């Protein structure tokens, strides 16, 4: 009898073990869909991005016009651009939900998988930031100026770093060229990191909502979860297409329709909505170096999650106090996002400072405390 090709061919065997015959816990819920949705987002962004790059010119004099040309004169250029811009928003929605799921169900205890995931998040944030600069509108220019200037807070080498990032003494043509090169390159790095992330995940197998070992109850990925993922794709792509076709500029900033002008500073510089929580934390500290450290810590704190797990139960499924704390953290992040979009004035300053303090308190102090307390309560 001939051997089954998908099980014997060296390349097909890898695909088979990752996507077809992969043993998967039978009880994983829809929260486990976001990994495949992120893969879909990445593929969509790379394809639309390549098509946009064919018509884009990374030069300060014509960058803005080349984007307008793509939307007006290229076949379906408007649709490709709208899908790419709004696809980034969906990418971040999916990654935040994916991280939230990992946090709620204790997936961070697969330490290598979790750490590569955090590196993926940081790379995605860098990619989105350099991408936002490319249309060379007012917000693009001033966003680039403000965020790259943060490096100047680093003692001793700060100013040198900033000038190196700018490629000169201000944000200008070398900056735009460099950012375009990075924006083209980083998605492929993300794709490579994704493969590492998946390889490490398949070493341990997926976690599940109960947080218990599920080796005795696993089913093949295909057809059960491939079908479930297909439904997830449809559920995600429908609102993405709706947004791109009916209200493409809903999540953007109107000021980015004005070409970049170094002589006119916008009254309120703010990043895209998915960075607002971190921006609010940055602004909540009056000192520049302190703000930069808090901004960095707001994301890097995720690396500490495995060490701050003090409960004997893996997931929060049966831990009501931790659940309350988790949803308080979610509400707190929404407050930070809202505050980040507001001008720097009373009462937003104090709200931002309180929300930033709460964010770090919940993650670094309350979660370990409550985890240990719940374990103690179980023993009584």
Swiss-Prot record:
Self-association and partners? The cytochrome bc1 complex contains 11 subunits: 3 respiratory subunits (MT-CYB, CYC1 and UQCRFS1), 2 core proteins (UQCRC1 and UQCRC2) and 6 low-molecular weight proteins (UQCRH/QCR6, UQCRB/QCR7, UQCRQ/QCR8, UQCR10/QCR9, UQCR11/QCR10 and a cleavage product of UQCRFS1). This cytochrome bc1 complex then forms a dimer.
Q: Name one GO biological process term.
A: mitochondrial electron transport, ubiquinol to cytochrome c
Residue numbers binding a ubiquinone: 202
What InterPro entries does the record tag this protein with?
A: Cyt_b/b6_C, Cyt_b/b6_C_sf, Cyt_b/b6_N, Cytb/b6-like_sf, Cytochrome_b, Cytochrome_b_C_euk/bac, Cytochrome_b_N_euk/bac, Di-haem_cyt_TM
Q: Does the keyword Aminoacyl-tRNA synthetase apply?
A: no
Residues that hold heme b b562 according to the record = 84, 183
Q: Which UniProt keywords apply?
A: Electron transport, Heme, Iron, Membrane, Metal-binding, Mitochondrion, Mitochondrion inner membrane, Respiratory chain, Transmembrane, Transmembrane helix, Transport, Ubiquinone
Stretches that traverse the bilayer: 34-54, 78-99, 114-134, 179-199, 227-247, 289-309, 321-341, 348-368
Q: How does it sit in the membrane?
A: Multi-pass membrane protein
Q: What is this protein called?
A: Cytochrome b
Detail which positions bind heme b b566.
98, 197
GO CC annotation terms, alphabetical? mitochondrial inner membrane; respiratory chain complex III
Note the Pfam families from the entry: Cytochrom_B_C, Cytochrome_B
> Where does this chain mainly localize?
mitochondrion
């Amino acid at each position: 009898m001939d051997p089954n090709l998908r099980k014997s061919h060296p390349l097909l065997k890898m695909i088979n073990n990752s996507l077809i015959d992969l043993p998967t816990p039978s009880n994983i819920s829809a929260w486990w869909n976001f990994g495949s949705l992120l893969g879909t987002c990445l593929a969509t962004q790379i394809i639309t991005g390549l098509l946009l790059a064919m018509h884009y010119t990374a030069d300060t004099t014509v960058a803005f016009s080349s984007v307008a040309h793509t939307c007006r004169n290229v076949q379906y250029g408007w649709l490709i651009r709208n899908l790419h811009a709004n696809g980034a928003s969906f990418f971040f929605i999916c990654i935040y939900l994916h991280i939230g799921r990992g946090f709620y169900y204790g997936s961070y205890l697969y330490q290598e998988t979790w750490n590569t995931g955090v590196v993926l998040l940081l790379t995605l944030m860098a990619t989105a930031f350099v991408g936002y600069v490319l249309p060379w509108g007012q917000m693009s220019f001033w966003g680039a100026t403000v965020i790259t200037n943060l490096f100047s807070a680093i003692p001793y080498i700060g100013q040198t770093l900033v000038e190196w990032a700018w490629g000169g003494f201000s944000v200008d043509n070398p900056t735009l060229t460099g950012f375009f090169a990075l924006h083209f390159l980083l998605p492929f790095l993300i794709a490579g990191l994704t493969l590492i992330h998946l390889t490490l995940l398949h070493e341990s197998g997926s976690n599940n909502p109960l947080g218990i070992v599920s080796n005795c109850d696993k089913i093949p990925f295909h057809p059960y979860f491939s079908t479930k993922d297909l439904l997830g794709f449809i559920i995600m792509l429908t609102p993405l297409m709706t947004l791109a076709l009916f209200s493409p500029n809903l999540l953007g900033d109107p000021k980015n329709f004005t070409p970049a002008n170094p002589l006119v500073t916008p009254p309120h510089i703010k990043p895209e909505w998915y960075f607002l929580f971190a921006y609010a934390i940055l602004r909540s500290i009056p000192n520049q170096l302190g703000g930069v450290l808090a901004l960095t810590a707001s994301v890097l704190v995720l690396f500490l999650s495995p060490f701050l797990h003090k409960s004997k139960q893996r997931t929060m499924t049966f831990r009501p106090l931790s659940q309350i704390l988790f949803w308080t953290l979610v509400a707190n992040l929404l407050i930070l996002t809202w505050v980040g979009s507001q001008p720097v004035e009373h009462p937003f300053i104090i709200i931002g400072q309180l929300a930033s303090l709460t964010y770090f308190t919940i993650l670094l102090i309350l979660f370990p405390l409550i985890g240990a307390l719940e374990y103690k309560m179980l023993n009584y």
